[in-house]
Amino acid sequence: MSSGLGDEVDKKLIVVLRDGRKFIGIMRTFDQFANIVLQDTIERIYVGDCYSDKNLGLFFIRGDNVVILGEIDPDKEVQEKKLKKISWDEITKAAALEKIKKEEEEQLKRRIMTESGLTIDSILNIDDF
């Protein structure tokens, strides 16, 4: 039994990128750099108990941006009883507000740490490499 991207061709996958975006589509091909092409692709955003999809069609994803990918069980793709589908505009606004809230919380944590005498000289990000 072999493992790798070859086993995922023609299957419906979810792909999570380094920036947190999530794409769902049918993988049609890949190359030696793990670049992949998805067909019938949607971008999905989750905020709280809500989600929204944006149709993108045929979509190319660079392999170095992929954090994780996996096959989607069609029967359990979205547990719609637990998640509420809302419009793309509503979800992007909610996601922006959530991002601002997280940034404010991080600033507060840093301020409290600094006032307590704890400092972090440098915070490394994967994009720094």
Swiss-Prot record:
Quaternary assembly: LSm subunits form a heteromer with a donut shape.
Protein name: Probable U6 snRNA-associated Sm-like protein LSm1
Function statement: Probably involved with other LSm subunits in the general process of degradation of mRNAs.
Subcellular location: Cytoplasm; Cytoplasm, P-body
Organism: Dictyostelium discoideum
GO BP annotation list: deadenylation-dependent decapping of nuclear-transcribed mRNA; mRNA catabolic process; mRNA processing; RNA splicing
Gene3D superfamilies on file: 2.30.30.100
PROSITE patterns for the chain: SM (PS52002)
Molecular function per GO: mRNA binding; RNA binding; RNA cap binding
